[in-house]
Amino acid sequence: MPSMRKLWIALTFLTRIPLPQPEQVTSEEFTQSQHYYPLVGLILGGALWLALTLLLPHYPPLVTAALLLALELILTGGIHLDGLMDSMDGLLSARTPERMLEIMKDSHVGAFGALSAMVYLLLKFSLLAGLLALSSPLVPYLVLFMPILSRWIFLIGVHYFPYARAQGFGQGFHETSRQTRWLFLGEGLLLLFLTYWVLQWPGIAGFILATLFILLFTRKVSRLLGGLTGDLYGASIELSELLFLLGAFPLLYP
């Protein structure tokens, strides 16, 4: 079952859900597995939706929002948040592009990374708590769609900007990604339709804001560094989730 294998590859790559690692993954399989990233987002979003549905009747919005954040970090292992911290350590260091890349590669978290994570988590927690307090029927579906859309949006950087390092997991994407760009765009149009069908204009506003922000962010960083890195892909996932909630909130707020 090639499709299930590609979903398996995508799941073990983007999450820390306890699954056995697939054996002998080829470069072609790894590249093609990217088309299953939104399905990985659906699994993550489904878990968050279920948790929200079970928790909100028994806990206040602040507690529910904190537990949702914790669950997402557990399911992903915090790998995307780690990418955000490493990216901010490098980008905010005000060093040369070469030195920024070296800082990103360092596994130790610096002050800029720690502060960025704190601000990010505070903003995301506040948005989730604020949305949950609105009691809108769309809010559970915003939480469901958040990881789905973010796993598509970050691929903008994969398809349209070079990889900054000579080696790394992202390099394999760029060797064969040109032939899949039309499919990638088709997937985006399908997600846009589904977002409007389920979430109407609040979802569309969040989707557009997140997509435009990541497009501009990856374009600017790619020009600065000569390309993107795995850490920046992780940062794009986290930032697109935040921007999605930020864009949807005003259209739901009374």
UniProtKB/Swiss-Prot annotation:
The keyword Nucleotidyltransferase does not apply. It comes from the Bacteria. It is an enzyme of class 2 (transferase). Its cofactor is Mg(2+). It is found in: Cell membrane. The chain crosses the membrane at residues 36-56, 61-81, 114-134, 138-158, 197-217, 232-252. Its main location: membrane. Keywords: Cell membrane, Cobalamin biosynthesis, Magnesium, Membrane, Transferase, Transmembrane, Transmembrane helix. This is Adenosylcobinamide-GDP ribazoletransferase. It comes from Desulfitobacterium hafniense (strain Y51).
